[in-house]
Amino acid sequence: MSGDVAEVPMAGFLCALAAKGPTVDEVTAFAEVMREKAGSVPHEGTVVEIVGTGGDEANTFNISTTSGFIISAAGIPVAKHGNRSVSSKCGAADLIEALGAKLELNGEQNEAVLNKANMCFMFAPVYHQAMKYAGPVRKALGVRTVFNILGPLANPAG
């Protein structure tokens, strides 16, 4: 999370962890560090936090983002969190961007969008800036890693 690990050892670690399967304690520790370093979106009241885990292996559409639109249209505020595709065909950010929305909104801007549109999109690179070190490795590996599990546990809206 600090850029101190070179890409090859990081790739080896992520592959080994994926092969053995992360323990609850390992996932918890990763999530705690991610949340400590993450930006946030202030909001009042309850919001549904929704994020997919990426790479459904069935090459379908982006289900979590579509679910967010439906939930929001039903009157329930949604704080959607996601990224570009890493291990699937279409990441949440790819879909949101294709619809013409701006991705790089800060917490206050997303709070205003949430209040006005009942849904906001928190682009992971804006809120999890430390992930810039793991991003290229994840993309090069092209397989699911522990980071796919961490998205839902590190939502910037709380």
What are these regions (language model features)?
Residues 6, 55-58, 94, 145, ...:
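Short, flexible micro-motifs
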Residues 52-57, 82-88, 127:
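Acidic, glycine-rich active-site loops and adjacent beta-strand->loop/helix elements
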Residues 48-49, 83-84, 154-155:
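Conserved catalytic-core motifs characterized by acidic clusters
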Residues 4-11, 21-28, 61, 65, ...:
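Electropositive phosphate-/nucleotide-binding environments in soluble metabolic enzymes
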Residues 14, 61-117:
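A glycine-rich phosphate/pyrophosphate-binding beta-strand-loop-alpha-helix module
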Residues 109-158:
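Phosphate/diphosphate-binding glycine-rich loops and adjacent basic-rich segments that engage nucleotide
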Residues 1-59, 70, 78:
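Acidic, glycine/proline-rich low-complexity segments that act as flexible tails and inter-domain linkers
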Residues 50, 78-82, 103-107, 121-123, ...:
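General beta-strand structural signal in soluble alpha/beta enzymes
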